[in-house]
Amino acid sequence: MHFETVIGLEVHVELKTDSKMFSPAPAHFGAKPNSNTNVIDLAYPGVLPVVNRRAVDWAMRASMALNMEIATESKFDRKNYFYPDNPKAYQISQFDQPIGENGYIDIEVDGETKRIGITRLHMEEDAGKSTHKDGYSLVDLNRQGTPLIEIVSEPDIRSPQEAYAYLEKLRSIIQYTGVSDCKMEEGSLRCDANISLRPYGQEEFGTKAELKNLNSFTYVRKGLEYEEKRQEEELLNGGEILQETRRFDESNGKTLLMRVKEGSDDYRYFPEPDIVPLYVDEEWKERVRQTIPELPDERKEKYVNQYGLPAYDAHVLTLTKEMSDFFEGAVAEGADVKLTSNWLMGGVNEYLNKNQIDLLDTKLTPENLAGMIKLIEDGTMSSKIAKKVFPELAENGGDAKQIMEDKGLVQISDEATLLKFVNEALDNNEQSIEDYKNGKGKAMGFLVGQIMKASKGQANPQLVNQLLKQELDKR
């Protein structure tokens, strides 16, 4: 029997507001524990919540960017549960009347475009953070009350790879809107995944498991891959899939049982009595719509049609707003479009991955990268020298030409000096001369390599090719 995988994702995104969802306390990351709180966050008796209008604006902006319908009337509800990092013993959320509904995004997997539906986007407040160790627990309520949006996909995702592509695209869109930085390492983007299997051709969904502790997109994919295999083996062996919550164990790549999954009835939702329903008229909607900036698909189209980049390059460059903004900044400084694209996707990305940092953690600027690329373009700096200059530029900033000079890496363009390297290479490799004369193209490349090696990569490659051909024709 063959099974079809059915996946739905619930993504929580922290909004980048200055204050919290229902209180004036600061909502910034990284403050001293329990310093960003006030009487509303701590659930003192008699205090009342006040809705953060900026958070509503940004929830609407995100909804519109995700092609959603904005509800004219929505309301807040109480989701009741007890946990130490939830002082009120309930969370203010939206249950049956969310701010946004019926959206979609288009993803690309294996060269195919697929539309993934989005059921809803609703607003809620975040809980605090509990840390458990050595038999005791610590609670930090700085995060308590931080504005969240929860984005719930339709069960349209059919593989872990599609789930990964969906998350990449969703993060990209939200980052471009400016409502969140979507940093998983800081908790400003979190994902829970629901997965079930059903026999091919069956309309009815199977029993789902919810996966938690998915701290990166890679872990989302790996957790779903393991769970897909686990459920398939269970069903093929005649077993039963239980509705349960499981956590992904990063150390062994497996999912482990946390608890039997609760349903919405267990939370005893009821309308929040301290907050009136939210009414959004057309004027408010239009005002928010005008604030939506250029989104990744629009930039991708521009890069292909205006800049002439391949679709793959355009896709990679627009995945994150910081990379796309950096690319546009460098091009605006006069850097060649394709060279800039190649460097950002190649040398820059390799450096970032190797050091496990973001572009904004470096000393790179569009200006200094453009300066280096223009030196490569006009022949002042070879690609080999650029690879030696770039780490210094990324770590300390400055001017690429000055770094090149300080390191003694100035490209050799003096013909007399280059001719010495050329003739030395020819004298030491007579067989290569014969191979060249017999039409073997690799011989030329070998000789160029010998010259570049002898000059420690500082020979001007264009001049080397010109002089080498000239000298070969004489022999």
Swiss-Prot record:
Family matches, as Pfam families: GatB_N (PF02934), GatB_Yqey (PF02637)
GO MF annotation terms: asparaginyl-tRNA synthase (glutamine-hydrolyzing) activity; ATP binding; glutaminyl-tRNA synthase (glutamine-hydrolyzing) activity
GO process annotations (BP): glutaminyl-tRNAGln biosynthesis via transamidation; translation
Keywords: ATP-binding, Ligase, Nucleotide-binding, Protein biosynthesis
Gene3D superfamilies the UniProt entry points to: 1.10.10.410, GatB domain, N-terminal subdomain
SUPFAM superfamilies: GatB/YqeY motif (SSF89095), Glutamine synthetase/guanido kinase (SSF55931)
InterPro entries documented for this protein: Asn/Gln-tRNA_amidoTrfase_suB/E, Asn/Gln-tRNA_Trfase_suB/E_cat, Asn/Gln_amidotransferase, Asn/Gln_tRNA_amidoTrase-B-like, GatB, GatB_C_1, GatB_Yqey_C_2, Gln-tRNA_amidoTrfase_suB_CS
Enzyme class: ligase
EC numbers, comma separated: 6.3.5.-
Function: Allows the formation of correctly charged Asn-tRNA(Asn) or Gln-tRNA(Gln) through the transamidation of misacylated Asp-tRNA(Asn) or Glu-tRNA(Gln) in organisms which lack either or both of asparaginyl-tRNA or glutaminyl-tRNA synthetases. The reaction takes place in the presence of glutamine and ATP through an activated phospho-Asp-tRNA(Asn) or phospho-Glu-tRNA(Gln).
Family (UniProt): Belongs to the GatB/GatE family. GatB subfamily.
SUBUNIT field: Heterotrimer of A, B and C subunits.
Name of the molecule in the record: Aspartyl/glutamyl-tRNA(Asn/Gln) amidotransferase subunit B
Originating organism: Staphylococcus saprophyticus subsp. saprophyticus (strain ATCC 15305 / DSM 20229 / NCIMB 8711 / NCTC 7292 / S-41)
Lineage of the organism: Bacteria, Bacillati, Bacillota, Bacilli, Bacillales
